[in-house]
Amino acid sequence: MNALAATNRNFRHASRILGLDSKIERSLMIPFREIKVECTIPKDDGTLVSYIGFRVQHDNARGPMKGGIRYHPEVDPDEVNALAQLMTWKTAVADIPYGGAKGGIGCSPRDLSLSELERLTRVFTQKIHDLIGIHTDVPAPDMGTNAQTMAWILDEYSKFHGHSPAVVTGKPIDLGGSLGREAATGRGVVFATEALLAEYGKSIQGLTFVIQGFGNVGTWAAKLIHEKGGKVVAVSDITGAIRNPEGIDINALIKHKDATGSLNDFNGGDAMNSDELLIHECDVLIPCALGGVLNKENAGDVKAKFIVEAANHPTDPDADEILSKKGVIILPDIYANAGGVTVSYFEWVQNIQGFMWEEEKVNLELQKYMTRAFHNIKTMCHTHSCNLRMGAFTLGVNRVARATQLRGWEA
């Protein structure tokens, strides 16, 4: 089952639990707008190459649409559609005044020079500039994009609309980015994990963690867990996987990866098969990489007691069912990785105010939002006798449905 089918399935389940009218259910499932554009650029050698770009604007009942732009060879309309829909529910779960969107270009950033990436980003912005905006649709970085990408979008958009720092988030600090934004998703994962563990009378200190993915999110999550006394016993990324039953020195591992670009040959742990990482012995498993990594083939062998979905859609529906029957507690992606979009909201607010917050304020506000959202999810779980995933979906879908009805859009 692909990401779109799984997302639609979760939405329909939440809709049935809430008893939504069929008209509003249909309205909430159909995207507001789907955009597909051709982006032709000259390569550094002068040859012309065309790429296909997408932007799906799913829903704006609760506010401007919000979501990342990813550069990846496997970007396709179904994936972008699913992720846009997830953003609608995610922003509602976090209770920030946004709807959902997502975008992407089917390209391999590693195969493009910096100047080629800039040209591609600017052409994409030229194609969609009149369909995004401060109060319309606010992009952000995602897989394969970063603060520099957002700077190019800001600059190109501003040529048409005047200086508009709030049109994108995840920007460099010097162009109106927020302090704390770089660590926000990983820090939010840790705040979410703390809220979950507290529900079971536990804390991060002394527990064992396995982290799949050592990019921005995985690195920050591992670093903060390490600082709070958690024992990270295994880590993987695209280059390989390592384990240490006594706990990995995360700061040393970060230095090693910064120096070598790889986890391989790190002397603070033993190499392991990446395929075995997800079934490694631990208290908490945190998938921070791609979707669909937990499936019916490996779910039965998972040994973790808790799974915190830092990645989007890491657990397919078959695995979800298997893990639930085993008693594994899953903290769903539409809540667990909402730290990034929450601090993006803080950045947008700061840009509109023309005022910059201290990093301590950003982190305290993030903790407040993540903790409050968890308790709201638990309330829905108790009300509807459902698991955390459906608690989060019913919370998000209900908020969007209410906004839709209040606007009179459901007819």
From Swiss-Prot:
Classification via Gene3D superfamilies: Leucine Dehydrogenase, chain A, domain 1, NAD(P)-binding Rossmann-like Domain
Reaction(s) this enzyme catalyzes, per UniProt: L-glutamate + NAD(+) + H2O = 2-oxoglutarate + NH4(+) + NADH + H(+); L-glutamate + NADP(+) + H2O = 2-oxoglutarate + NH4(+) + NADPH + H(+)
EC number: 1.4.1.3
Keyword set, alphabetical order: Mitochondrion, NAD, Oxidoreductase
SUPFAM superfamilies found in the cross-reference section: Aminoacid dehydrogenase-like, N-terminal domain, NAD(P)-binding Rossmann-fold domains
Active-site residues from the entry: K102
Recorded superkingdom: Eukaryota
One example of a Gene Ontology biological process annotation: amino acid metabolic process
GO CC field: mitochondrion; plant-type vacuole; plasma membrane
InterPro entries in UniProt: Aminoacid_DH-like_N_sf, Glu/Leu/Phe/Val/Trp_DH, Glu/Leu/Phe/Val/Trp_DH_C, Glu/Leu/Phe/Val/Trp_DH_dimer, Glu/Leu/Phe/Val_DH_AS, Glu_DH, NAD(P)-bd_dom_sf, NAD_bind_Glu_DH
Enzyme class per UniProt: oxidoreductase
Subcellular location: Mitochondrion
Molecular function terms from GO: ATP binding; cobalt ion binding; copper ion binding; glutamate dehydrogenase (NAD+) activity; glutamate dehydrogenase (NADP+) activity; glutamate dehydrogenase [NAD(P)+] activity; zinc ion binding
Family the entry assigns: Belongs to the Glu/Leu/Phe/Val dehydrogenases family.
Protein name: Glutamate dehydrogenase 2
Species of provenance: Arabidopsis thaliana (Mouse-ear cress)
